[in-house]
Amino acid sequence: MPSPKLSSLILAPIAAVAFLASCAPSAPGGERHGAASSALTAQARLTACEQDPRVVAGLVTREICAGADIFFRETFEGNGRSCGTCHPVENNFTIDIPFIDTLIDNNPLDPLFIFEQEPELEELETFELKTLGLIRVNIDGYDDLDNKYVMRGVPHTLSMATTIAPDPANGTEGVPVHRTGWSGDGAPGSGSLREFLTGAITQHFPTDLGREPGVAFRLPTEDELDLTLAYQMSLGRTNELDLTQVSLTDPEANEGRLAFLDPARGRCNVCHSNAGANHLDSGLNRNLDTGTRTAPASGTIGAFDGGFGGKDQAEPNLDVIGLGFKHGFGDGTFNVPPIIEAVDTPPFFHTNAFGPDIEGAVAFYISNQFKQSPAGQELEARFGAPIAFPDSDIVKIGRFLRVLSAAFNVDLARQRLDAALVLVNRFHDSSADVQERLMKLADVELDDALQVLAVGGTPLHPASRDRLRLAKAEIAAGLTATRWSQRQGRLAAAISRVKVARDQFGSNITYRLGKGNLMD
């Protein structure tokens, strides 16, 4: 048993700790975090986090803990939304149609749908949030709300430590200092990820569309900006793979790896080096015009999304979709996302118009739409021929990416299960709620891995999928356990099952994971 002193520390009934500990996640689409514009200051959150068992055990820093609390629960005196409203941890930090449909059924008054509940916010979103998963974004400014907006999918917030350093090759050195959002210019001010929070509050949190700070919302403090940044930079993975050293046990997946790397076949590695978001030449994130802008999913005026750099344009400067006249703002380029995380966050690209599976996104790159785009033409000039690969390579590249994604999912699950076991060993039942939350989030990641590995044709790692199902059964049993020792045994068994499943994928698929993955 933990010492009486330690038990009293963890269970201390102070208001701040109760606030932090009372907000467990549930199944996607169910009752979500109790977001509120609280009286907690950043310092109060830091103090409360000193008593979080994950911090006490050294699994998470108090800064990451406090940043997560802001991310998921602080509404900044706005309309009830938090960052977690559109970036739920239970759904890979994004929203999609299945998630939205379930949320409509389970909680139709969720703040995501505030535009249907408050007349003054009717134009905050459009009906396409529910039908296409697209949100309304005034990326080019708020001077013409009726006409100057775009419709975009919600990008996940995973692994941003690897994706936001801008490539000077775009000719935009200086501002923005980070590549954020779908067009790489999503943050106000200097364009930093730190300042992205200010832009998100202004865009998505207001109580009215006048968006006056201090009236429609409050701005974050300097400490809140710092803490939220610390949390976001600790999500997902913090390293890149070396695909030349990776070897996959599934023959078709490994052949897909070779096609991905081969400039005579996929050429994927040029713009998505090591299946990440950075360019091969620089190791930095580059904006590209790949032609996805010419096929929007949306039929509203917001479909005319010109991408990067539209904010300073007084009049439309770009023919976005080939109408013969200028109707969009920007230079046509968009931010390159990491592929490892993209596999289980469909649909794809900023328009949500491609998918539903990763193979659909791969197939886009042999379409005329891509070949005729500036990015496609650049690759043709570089290698002396248009990009071309057979349909069989679409399947193989898809299998390769699915294995990388499943390995990432399994590693996230393992990280959370390991943390839960540390807590049960140290604190026994005194932190059971946190242990169980970690177990539930691990279970969600195992579901993702199983879904990613479930492909048509030749089965992809059937033995691993069996082990993952057994691990899920151990987690389920652990969640119903009445004593810590029972939960301890189930966790150990689940970890063993997960390890065996993961080992069968291949070698050198090594992810370093951020500590923020343990928060919710």
Label every PLM stretch briefly.
Residues E31-D520:
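Periplasmic c-type cytochrome electron-transfer domains
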Residues C23-P25:
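N-terminal Sec signal peptide cleavage junction
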Residues P2-P13:
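Bacterial N-terminal signal peptides that target proteins for export
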